[in-house]
Amino acid sequence: MDLSEPIHDFLLVFLGSGLILGGLGVVLLPNPIYSAFSLGLVLICTSLFYILSNSYFVAAAQLLIYVGAINVLIIFAVMFMNGSEYYKDFHLWTVGDGITSMVCISLFISLITTISDTSWYGIIWTTRSNQIIEQDFLSNSQQIGIHLSTDFFLPFELISIILLVALIGAIAVARQ
């Protein structure tokens, strides 16, 4: 999107806070339904980040696949489960929660210090000029198709085989 810099920065901060709040909601909310809705918020904010970075195809795929299918499947699975078993042994804070939060906080602090200590201006971003001219004539979906059929052919085929095995396994489990 061609937005002015203050509007772009405001949307970036707004979507980032939505991502952080949604992620905290996924982890901290005791009700699984609310946690699934928070996951939906995280996935929607992620797709809006893709729209801000002019990746419209990836944003549409994110919305259709993750929000439209995966998150709805999670919500249906949670709704079919017995909700009363979640509140039987609900303790507010356990030792495992403390250890996990300390590990997460230490990882977060190390990530922040690594990002702030990195000299980003020393990195040279190089591209070929003819590659930029060629990419101007192609849409995002055409570029994705070209890269999937040339540069990423083997990983694309391996992922399709893994998904096929997972689908066959799910059918075998569902039959029993």
UniProtKB/Swiss-Prot annotation:
Topology class, membrane? Multi-pass membrane protein
InterPro entries the UniProt entry points to:
NAD(P)H-Q_Oxidoreduct_6 (IPR050290), NADH_UbQ/plastoQ_OxRdtase_su6 (IPR001457), Nuo/plastoQ_OxRdtase_6_NuoJ (IPR042106)
Q: Would I find Thylakoid among this entry's keywords?
A: yes
Q: What class of enzyme is it?
A: translocase
State a GO cellular component annotated for this protein.
Answer: chloroplast thylakoid membrane
What GO MF annotations does this protein's record show? NADH dehydrogenase (ubiquinone) activity; quinone binding
Membrane-crossing ranges are: 10-30, 32-52, 61-81, 92-112, 152-172
Location within or outside the cell: Plastid, Chloroplast thylakoid membrane
Question: Quaternary form?
Answer: NDH is composed of at least 16 different subunits, 5 of which are encoded in the nucleus.
From the Swiss-Prot or TrEMBL record, give the protein name.
Answer: NAD(P)H-quinone oxidoreductase subunit 6, chloroplastic
Q: Which gene encodes it?
A: ndhG
